[in-house]
């Protein structure tokens, strides 16, 4: 089997292998609302040159919860906004309730059961929520999900089955419908955590 690889300067190279592993990950996906491009993603949050005085994080999954804890731990005024009633939707309800309670106890401001209507940029970012609340912060981070990074791979063209969310469909052995091609991590519909792909 051959793979055609292009480097940053568009130089092409063919690589041959018996089996091919796809582990290209995913990228942040933001909801569509006015000012959504004012948000930074988790990668950009790690590249900040200095800590903001305040941040709003939009989302309730493990990335949002992790970054809320990190920023709060560094003394940043942290606001966590999400649609569900508690953080970590899909996890055990007792864990979700206790974790949300502990986040509040540590000083994280929680705004459950709301969505962002718009983000305006002035001296600070002004985030308007669906319940008419306005939150003023130095940064706004989106952590509402990730989409597989497959658009440049050409996997559809060779017949690899793709799911509704744009993910590569794999079996319990991470094998695609093409027996010599495997996929792991955010590019699949399985558990999407960095350590799975490593």
Per-segment meaning from a language model:
Residues 46-47, 52-56, 62-126, 131, ...:
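Rossmann-like dinucleotide-binding cores of NAD(P)H-dependent redox enzymes
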Residues 24, 41-43, 112-114, 120, ...:
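Short loop/edge segments at beta-strand edges and connector loops
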Residues 1-38:
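Glycine/serine-rich phosphate-binding loop and adjoining beta1-alpha1 elements at the start
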Residues 37-52, 135-198:
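FAD-site-proximal beta/loop scaffold in flavoenzymes
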Residues 1-14, 120-134, 140:
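Conserved beta-strand-loop-beta-strand element in the redox core of flavoprotein oxidoreductases
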Residues 14-25, 57-58, 78, 135-145, ...:
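Short hydrophobic core segments
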């Amino acid at each position: 089997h051959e793979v055609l690889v292009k480097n940053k300067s568009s130089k092409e190279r063919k690589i041959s292998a018996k089996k091919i592993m796809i582990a290209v990950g995913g990228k942040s996906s933001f909801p569509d609302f006015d000012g959504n491009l004012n948000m930074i993603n988790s990668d950009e949050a790690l590249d900040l040159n200095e800590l903001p005085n305040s941040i709003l994080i939009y989302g309730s999954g493990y990335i949002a919860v992790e970054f809320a804890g990190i920023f709060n731990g560094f003394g940043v005024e942290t606001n966590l906004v999400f649609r569900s009633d508690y953080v970590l939707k899909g996890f055990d309800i007792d864990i979700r309730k206790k974790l949300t309670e502990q986040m509040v106890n540590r000083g994280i401001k929680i705004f459950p059961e709301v969505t962002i209507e718009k983000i305006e940029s002035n001296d600070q970012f002004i985030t308007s929520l669906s319940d008419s609340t306005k939150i003023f912060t130095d940064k706004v981070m989106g952590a509402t999900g990730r989409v597989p990074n497959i658009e440049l791979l050409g996997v559809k063209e060779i017949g690899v089955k793709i799911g509704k969310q744009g993910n590569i469909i794999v079996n319990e052995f991470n094998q695609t419908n093409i027996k010599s091609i495997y996929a792991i991590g955010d590019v699949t519909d399985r558990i999407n955590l960095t350590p799975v792909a490593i």
